């Protein structure tokens, strides 16, 4: 499809995504406050992810990213809403990359918590204060790695300046060069028929893949171990087992959503230039997916956790008594969850 059509789709997804993200996450935060009293420290993880999702959606709305793959180069281009320096634009793009990486890392932490709750309950103390505060510090390491390589290993050069100008002129001719900032992932170039590989850029991509792979391995291992343990142990109450299964189903779906909307598109984003696959403006399907992701992910929790779902349904139907009953049921159920 043409660049103009893709920009229309991306901008529409931006509006839909930020609206959905705000509505769903505010509802989830309200449910956590009124129905999550006895959910333990897990409610803090869900609350953090909700707040982060809102923040991520705001960043995307401000930066208005577009993506383009052409001539062994992947371009992350941000359309400026107001004028600022090239250096600040580079920092903004790297910060967007940090938010992108955070979504992977936090998903992994969710699975670690459920793994501890089901398989290693004695380790749940690591999610209590004050050690709970160490988790953001640990998560910041891979996030900082991702953002740092995006900023330092992909400098603007004469080639990238000419390349991004050519991309804008050929595919997005209504966007002026001075109104964008960008990061160009150049894998290699051909000069006089000889291929010159950019080792720094390939190293940066390796770091990105390492972070993605590690978070995916953590989710897969913890998810499998949790499922196996739940099926082996029959000595827990029906209420506890039911709630554990609801939370596990939510996490499984919360793995599928980022896999479809984040992992798979990002994998294509980094692999296509290496094999000289010119997706051109079609690479914007990655942005399209990323705009919708922050609103879809927390929606899973609301739909899967029965008491959350019933509370919303009863509220919409005006059944106050049922809502109060749901609150009591929620407290009874969640009191069974390890904290």
Curated annotation (Swiss-Prot):
Ranges per topology, Cytoplasmic: 33-42, 114-131, 223-254, 306-339
Entry-listed glycosylation sites: 71, 83, 179
Tissue specificity annotation: Strongly expressed in the sensory cilia of AWA olfactory neurons, and at low levels in the CEP neurons.
Location of this chain's protein in the cell: Cell projection, Cilium membrane
Swiss-Prot/TrEMBL induction comment: Induced upon exposure to the volatile odorant diacetyl.
Segment forming the signal sequence: none
Listed GO MF terms: G protein-coupled olfactory receptor activity; G protein-coupled receptor activity; G-protein alpha-subunit binding
GO cellular component entries: ciliary membrane; dendrite; neuronal cell body; non-motile cilium; periciliary membrane compartment; plasma membrane
Topological relation to the membrane, as annotated: Multi-pass membrane protein
Extracellular topology ranges: 1-11, 64-92, 153-201, 276-284
Keywords: Cell membrane, Cell projection, Chemotaxis, Cilium, Glycoprotein, Membrane, Olfaction, Receptor, Sensory transduction, Transmembrane, Transmembrane helix
UniProt-listed InterPro entries: 7TM_GPCR_serpentine_rcpt_Str
Subunit structure: Interacts with odr-4.
UniProt record similarity statement: Belongs to the nematode receptor-like protein str family.
Biological role stated in the UniProt entry: An odorant receptor which affects chemotaxis to the volatile odorant diacetyl. Specifies AWA neuronal cell fate via the odr-7 pathway.
Name of the protein described by the UniProt record: Serpentine receptor class r-10
The organism of origin for this protein: Caenorhabditis elegans
């Amino acid at each position: 499809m043409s660049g103009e059509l893709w920009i229309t789709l991306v901008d529409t997804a931006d509006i839909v995504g930020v609206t959905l993200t705000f509505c769903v996450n505010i509802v989830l935060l309200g449910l956590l406050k009124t129905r999550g009293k006895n959910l333990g420290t897990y409610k803090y993880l869900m609350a953090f992810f909700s707040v982060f999702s809102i923040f991520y959606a705001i960043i995307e709305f401000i930066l208005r990213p577009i993506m383009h793959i052409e001539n062994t180069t992947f371009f992350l281009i941000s359309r400026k809403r107001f004028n600022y320096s090239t250096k600040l634009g580079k920092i903004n793009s790297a910060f967007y990359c940090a938010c992108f990486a955070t979504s992977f890392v936090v998903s992994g932490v969710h699975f670690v918590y459920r793994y501890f709750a089901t398989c290693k309950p004695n380790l749940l103390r690591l999610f209590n204060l004050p050690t709970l505060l160490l988790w953001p510090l640990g998560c910041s390491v891979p996030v900082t790695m991702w953002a740092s390589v995006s900023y330092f290993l992909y400098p603007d050069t004469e080639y990238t300046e000419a390349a991004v100008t050519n991309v804008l002129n050929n595919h997005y001719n209504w966007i002026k060069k001075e109104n964008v900032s960008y990061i160009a992932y150049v894998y290699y170039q051909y000069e006089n028929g000889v291929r010159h590989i950019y080792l720094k850029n390939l190293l940066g991509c390796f770091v990105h893949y390492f972070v993605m792979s590690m978070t995916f391995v953590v989710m897969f291992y913890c998810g499998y171990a949790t499922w196996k343990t739940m099926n082996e142990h029959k000595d827990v109450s029906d209420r506890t087992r039911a709630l554990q299964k609801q939370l596990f189903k939510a996490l499984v779906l919360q793995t599928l959503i980022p896999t479809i909307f984040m992992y798979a598109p990002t994998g294509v984003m980094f692999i296509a230039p290496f094999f000289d696959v010119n997706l051109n403006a079609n690479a914007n399907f990655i942005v399209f997916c990323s705009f919708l992701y922050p609103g879809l992910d927390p929606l899973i929790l609301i739909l899967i956790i029965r008491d959350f779902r019933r509370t919303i349904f009863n509220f919409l139907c005006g059944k106050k008594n049922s809502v109060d009953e749901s609150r009591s049921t929620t407290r009874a159920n969640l009191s069974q969850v390890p904290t």
